[in-house]
Design a protein with these regions (language model features):
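Glycine-rich FAD pyrophosphate-binding loop
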Residues: 22-43
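N-terminal Rossmann-fold NAD(P) dinucleotide-binding loop
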Residues: 14-15
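Conserved FAD-binding catalytic core of PHBH/FMO-like flavoproteins
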Residues: 63, 120, 138, 145, ...
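FAD/FMN-dependent oxidoreductases across multiple families
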Residues: 234, 249-313, 333, 348, ...
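A conserved beta-strand/loop element that lines the FAD pocket in flavoprotein oxidoreductases
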Residues: 124-136
């Protein structure tokens, strides 16, 4: 059995990658070890950027129909001190603050619902073979592709499949990553975390004081800066909760109801439906590529469920890698394009880890160590009010970008990362923030499947130069003459080259740009 790409791991990232490839006329085989989707409610906090991916993959309506939480609940939550019913609380993690910079909105639904939607879409494409109940065993690389051995998870048959490329989307313990010898850098926190899934109507009633909120974080002096995170699964009393527990904790030797009720701040009825554990550690692969083998999602980077960074980052891995594999398939990729996958995605997660996840833990730890209402009430309340009046930096300053990418025409010495300030100015290496066009046209819908040149001044010579730089090489380019759209002041550039993943490859002056040089760099020549 052959395909253009073999994907090991049929979770959300693997299937999303397969869909993206299918939209670019590439066939894939997805090898998934489980027979059915795992019914654990994680990966729920989906960003507006992920909403753009859903729009690109053609699943927005299905995603919204699958969500068990009304859209009126929004994307924000509540942070509290000590427990969820504390007198000290404030609005927290409101991703709606930055929605104007995206062509979609936030979504919230359990990961298994997202997977169901993506699998249905995958089946519609006619280009994806999903092999459920099969496990990866080994891979051999040669000059023109890979040969992969798989076996049925429950024992029995084995098969050999081949393709030009293999992508491991097979989780934090990735067998694909291990098979090709990709090493990891691990930041251990030596904490055991418990994930509890449960039903409690009384909790619904207790938290009604906050109105329509779906997520809650109790910053407890007993937790050393680690989150006690509570998330609503639906409106039928189903919730999930995660928090640190003592080393050696098992399902049998620990009182999880007591832990939960302490975090809530009241006795509630609890019916547990799932109890699981994981080690709190942050892992980052040292490269995302070894020859013709790539890794994405948790196989490339894993961390505790802080802020929904995992699934959203994994989806962005898929968008980034898909267009580059498609460029190779189409014969227009430069020699260095595939290397740019690691060059772009690796520093983004390194920054996410250091500047958001670890920073959040350390800042919360410093707060609970420095302030306590029983020790100095005035000092505590002043510090708490400063937190409450902040700019929600976990949201407003989270801006993944590729300023330092070798395939972006940016400033010399720039560094890629995940921090920044949202805005509409077109910046090389940044996501294109869409603006409305006259006559209610949607700029996002006008962007081509390949590169798109936005000509904001109607410069015919510019258009001819870019056409000449792309057409002979078969590089897909859509040219949009937007001279009448009034976007020059908004974007701060006369022309913008947008990549297939809607990041900006170049922005600048129309008259003196080297179109051939820009295209060469953007395609990794």
């Amino acid at each position: 059995m052959n395909a253009d790409v073999i994907i090991v791991g049929g979770g959300p990232v693997g299937v999303a990658l397969a869909i993206d490839l299918a939209l670019q006329d590439m066939k894939s085989i997805v090898v998934e070890r489980h027979d059915s989707i795992q019914q654990v409610p994680k990966g729920q906090n989906l960003t507006a950027r992920t909403g753009e991916h859903f729009r690109h993959w053609g699943v927005t309506s299905a995603i919204r129909a699958a969500s068990p939480i009304p859209r009126s609940y929004g994307s924000g939550g509540v942070a509290t001190y000590d427990n969820y019913l504390s007198d000290y609380h404030y609005e927290w993690f409101n991703r709606a603050r930055i929605v104007d910079y995206y062509a979609a909105t936030n979504e919230r639904l359990p990961q298994y619902r997202t997977e169901e939607v993506l699998r249905a879409r995958a089946a519609e494409t006619g280009k994806i073979t999903l092999m459920r109940g099969w496990s990866f065993q080994s891979v051999e690389q040669h000059d023109h592709g890979v040969v992969v051995d798989i076996t049925m998870t429950q024992g029995g048959d084995s098969q050999t499949i081949s393709a030009p490329f293999l992508v491991g989307c097979d989780g934090a313990r990735s067998p694909v990553r291990e098979a090709v010898g990709i090493t990891q850098t691990v930041d251990p926190h030596d904490r055991l975390m418990a994930l509890l899934v449960f039903n409690s109507r009384q909790l619904d009633e207790r938290l009604a004081i906050y109105g329509e909120k779906a997520i809650f974080n109790a910053i407890s002096p007993d937790m050393n800066g680690y989150w006690q995170f509570l998330g609503r699964v639906d409106l039928d009393g189903n919730w999930f909760f995660h928090a640190p527990v003592p080393p050696g904790t098992t399902r049998e030797n620990f009182n999880f109801e007591e832990l939960l009720c302490k975090a809530v701040g009241a006795e509630i009825d609890v019916d547990f439906t799932y109890v699981g554990f994981w080690d709190l550690r942050l892992s980052l692969a040292d490269t995302y590529r070894q020859g013709r083998v790539f890794i994405a999602g948790d196989a490339a980077h894993s961390h505790p469920p802080y802020g929904g960074y995992g699934i959203n980052t994994g989806f962005e891995d898929a968008r980034n890698l898909a267009w580059k594999l498609a460029a190779c398939h189409g014969g227009w990729a430069g020699a260095h394009l595939l290397d740019s996958y690691t060059a772009e995605r690796h520093p983004v997660f390194a920054s996410t880890r250091d500047d958001f996840i670890v920073k959040s833990i350390l800042e919360d730890r410093d707060f609970v160590d420095s302030y306590h209402p029983e020790r100095d009430l005035a000092a505590f309340e002043a510090a708490w009010n400063r937190r409450a009046g902040g700019d929600d930096s976990l949201v407003t300053q989270y801006l993944p970008h590729y300023e330092g990418s070798p395939i972006v025409c940016g400033e010399a010495g720039a560094v890629s990362g995940a921090t920044g300030r949202h805005g509409f100015t077109a910046r090389a290496g940044h996501h294109l923030a869409p603006r409305p066009l006259p006559d209610e046209q949607d700029l996002w819908d006008m962007l081509g499947p390949g590169f798109t040149l936005l000509d904001l001044t109607g410069n015919a010579d510019l258009q001819r130069r870019f056409d000449a730089a792309t057409k002979p090489r078969g590089i897909p380019l859509e040219i949009l003459d937007l001279a009448e759209a009034g976007l020059l002041k908004t974007y701060g550039a006369e022309a913008i080259l947008v990549r297939p993943d809607h990041f900006i490859a170049w922005a600048g002056s129309a008259n003196d740009c080297d179109a051939t040089g820009i295209i060469d760099q953007a395609t990794g020549a």
